[in-house]
Amino acid sequence: MRLKTLAGVKTMCIDEERFEQAKNRIIGVSRERQGIGTLSEKTTHAVLKNYYAPDPAVHEIPVADFVADICDGKEIIEIQTRSFQAMRRKLAAFLPEYPVTIVYPIPRQKWLYWIDEETGETSAGRKSPKKGNPYQAFIELYKIRQFLGDPNLHFRFALLDMEEYRLLNGWSRDRKKGSERFDRIPTAFVEEVCIDCREDYMQFVPYEIPENFTAKEFAKCAKIPVRLAQTTLLLLTEQKIVERIGKEGRSYLYRVCEILS
């Protein structure tokens, strides 16, 4: 997926060969024969860690009172597959000392598999109708909004195709609702969206947005839910990418700020 924006999408070239090597190192080429039960519970985290830093000597390095996923003495890379709220204390310790890049995987296309804990059987895969996009990261960015202005903080949103394995242990009759996620297996690295400075947030403003717009109009142009658009606009306002200029009925009215180079 490409974000069509005013400033253009800032992406990095995906090294497909290195990604396959990272997958094979963690998953193993014979995982289909061995079965899902042999896999690590944090496969996506491990694959991305090996993609961004193939040298294991820089993995799991003590820094301050914490352990960094990757640290080569010059910078830190953190692979964050869950809530960014857990990153607050780490960021407070890391950012004064090192540039920190947070890698956040987003499922672009997902295939769902169900595991019966009693029999060990795994269902056939079903393609999820939902597709992920980079705007989803703003839900997590909101949780560390106090750090977003730090020039040492960078982001890589990794859009991945993946298989998701869930345990049939939920509360509903079919045991799917409220079920536990067992593992996510990345199958393809589709795109990487980068944020390295304040101006990079401009790429999240849709190209076709009107000069003055509401959150509902932003949501329509970005093809995201209104609630997600509201969160995105809150952070874009704080980063001085957009500004509130009044109201239209009960809705806030926004416009894009002029970005000075």
Regions found by a protein language model. Give the residues of each.
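Short, cationic-aromatic polyanion-contact patches
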Residues: K247-S261
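Short amphipathic alpha-helical interaction segments
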Residues: I224-T237
